[in-house]
């Protein structure tokens, strides 16, 4: 009997699965006889329970298992016979109008879509390029110096000076204060502190608070009003105005280390050579720039491929990917130590758009790779593993680590395939180069 595949929509299909009841019952009886050999019931030795009692106890459960197995196998056989590329899992529902003597089920499912790849030559890609300048190295050195800042009491003489004659607090100073805040004369949680330290100008405190501390000298006090923003994280004070009194207890000025041999040694340059230090910084920035520009270009290529391709996306695959993203989000919460993260409700709907893009992109890439033979070659995978291993102390051990685990190797293979796709698209598309500074590149990729 020919299988009839009903077309319910662009991707949705339905087939009817029929199973003779006598064949099902025969399998049920066989499984119950096997079960009876080991089943335990009060008052009977193992394997000595009467078959009738075993049947009464387990017939329903065994029948459900047999039906599930046989329906699944027949669906698989039909899918193979009809060359159906099933996307996701089918849903089975019993039919009320089954032929007498048969069980009948409707299997509803989706199939993989036809992917129509557009002309890659019409894609437009803006390829970001970054050249590391001396100014960028200087900016990085400034950041590194600020990370190693240490503070000295303003006005007190020391090996690095006294910070200037002016002993009033100014931007960049680390100040220590006592403060008391009240709303309508009542203290509120978090509104009072002693020996509270912060750096003026860093933006850690609300602007009115920093403004009040600026210009104060040790021992001086000031009263001021502070309006909490409507979106302030402390809901009990958000949108309200508090009256604060602040007393300056300590003012420390920042001393940045000089760029000298000792500074270079602190960055891992053993002989303290400043030229080596700058070259090392340049190399690091160039590696980081390459990584970031590759990410930007890759995203542009993927966007371009989605734009020129036509396909319908199976809902089943989107739902599966939503669940994967939910689990990834949950694992992230667990790793960050969020309380009750394992049981936290994470609605799958919040990942709907992301999941659809991921699934659509996966289908497009699979078609492009197949059509243009862009699969990863073993030598490409090895070259990438070797390149990655170079940055470690024992590259050979890193290579062994990769090749000892198929999942890790599969991840590298996927990376190589993506690189092949990017190179292929760039060789065909309309590409324009855009020079940006490292700072602009870092800002753009941080927001992505």
Curated annotation (Swiss-Prot):
Superkingdom per UniProt: Bacteria
Cellular compartments per GO CC: cytoplasm
Keyword annotations: Cell cycle, Cell division, Chaperone, Cytoplasm, Isomerase, Rotamase
Subcellular localization(s) per the UniProt record: Cytoplasm
Keyword Chaperone: yes
Domain PPIase FKBP-type: residue ranges: 172-257
Keyword Isomerase: yes
Reactions listed under catalytic activity: [protein]-peptidylproline (omega=180) = [protein]-peptidylproline (omega=0)
SS bonds (residue pairs): none
Example GO BP: cell division
EC number of the protein: 5.2.1.8
Protein name: Trigger factor
Domain-related comment: Consists of 3 domains; the N-terminus binds the ribosome, the middle domain has PPIase activity, while the C-terminus has intrinsic chaperone activity on its own.
Molecular functions (GO terms): peptidyl-prolyl cis-trans isomerase activity; protein folding chaperone; ribosome binding
Gene name linked to the record: tig
Recorded family membership: Belongs to the FKBP-type PPIase family. Tig subfamily.
PROSITE patterns listed in its UniProt record: FKBP_PPIASE
HAMAP family: Trigger_factor_Tig
Function: Involved in protein export. Acts as a chaperone by maintaining the newly synthesized protein in an open conformation. Functions as a peptidyl-prolyl cis-trans isomerase.
Organism of derivation: Paraburkholderia phymatum (strain DSM 17167 / CIP 108236 / LMG 21445 / STM815) (Burkholderia phymatum)
PANTHER family the UniProt entry points to: TRIGGER FACTOR CHAPERONE AND PEPTIDYL-PROLYL CIS/TRANS ISOMERASE (PTHR30560), TRIGGER FACTOR-LIKE PROTEIN TIG, CHLOROPLASTIC (PTHR30560:SF3)
InterPro entries hit by this protein: PPIase_dom_sf (IPR046357), PPIase_FKBP_dom (IPR001179), Trig_fac (IPR005215), Trigger_fac_C (IPR008880), Trigger_fac_C_sf (IPR037041), Trigger_fac_ribosome-bd_bac (IPR008881), Trigger_fac_ribosome-bd_sf (IPR036611), Trigger_fact/SurA_dom_sf (IPR027304)
């Amino acid at each position: 009997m020919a299988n009839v595949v009903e077309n319910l929509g662009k991707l949705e299909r339905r087939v009817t699965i029929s199973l003779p009841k006598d064949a099902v019952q025969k399998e049920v009886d066989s499984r119950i006889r096997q079960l009876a050999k080991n089943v335990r019931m009060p008052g009977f030795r193992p394997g000595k329970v009467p078959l009738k009692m075993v049947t009464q106890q387990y017939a329903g459960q065994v029948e459900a298992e047999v039906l599930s197995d046989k329906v699944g196998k027949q669906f698989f056989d039909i899918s193979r016979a009809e060359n159906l590329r099933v996307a996701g899992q089918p849903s089975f529902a019993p039919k009320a109008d089954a032929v007498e003597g048969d069980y009948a089920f409707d299997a509803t499912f989706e199939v993989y879509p036809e992917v129509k790849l557009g002309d890659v030559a019409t894609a437009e890609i803006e390829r970001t390029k970054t050249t590391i300048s001396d100014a960028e190295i200087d900016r990085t050195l400034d950041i590194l110096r600020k990370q190693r800042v240490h503070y000295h009491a303003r006005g007190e003489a020391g090996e690095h000076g006294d910070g200037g004659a002016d002993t009033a607090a100014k931007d960049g100073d680390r100040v220590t204060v006592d403060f008391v805040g009240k709303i309508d004369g009542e203290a509120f949680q978090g509104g009072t502190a002693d020996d509270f330290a912060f750096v003026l100008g860093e933006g850690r405190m609300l602007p009115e608070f920093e403004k009040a501390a600026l210009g104060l000298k040790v021992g001086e006090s000031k009263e001021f009003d502070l309006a909490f923003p409507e979106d302030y994280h402390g809901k009990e004070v958000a949108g309200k105005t508090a009256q604060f009194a602040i007393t300056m207890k300590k003012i420390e000025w920042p001393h940045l280390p000089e760029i000298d041999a000792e500074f270079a040694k602190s960055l891992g340059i053993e002989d303290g050579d400043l030229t080596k230090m700058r070259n090392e910084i340049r190399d690091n920035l160039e590696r980081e720039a390459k990584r970031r520009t590759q990410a930007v270009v890759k995203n542009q290529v993927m966007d371009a491929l989605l734009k020129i391709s036509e396909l319908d996306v199976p809902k089943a695959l989107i739902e599966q990917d939503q669940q994967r993203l939910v689990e990834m989000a949950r694992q992230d919460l667990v790793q960050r130590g969020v309380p009750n993260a394992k049981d936290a409700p994470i609605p799958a709907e919040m990942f709907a758009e992301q999941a659809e893009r991921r699934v659509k992109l996966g289908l497009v890439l699979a078609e492009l790779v197949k059509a243009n033979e862009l699969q990863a070659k073993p030598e490409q995978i090895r070259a990438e593993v070797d390149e990655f291993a170079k940055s470690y102390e024992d590259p050979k051990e890193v290579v062994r680590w990769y090749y000892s685990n198929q999942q890790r190797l599969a991840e590298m293979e996927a990376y190589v395939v993506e690189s092949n796709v990017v190179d292929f698209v760039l060789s065909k598309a309309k590409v324009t180069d855009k020079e940006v500074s490292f700072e602009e590149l870092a800002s753009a990729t941080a927001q992505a």
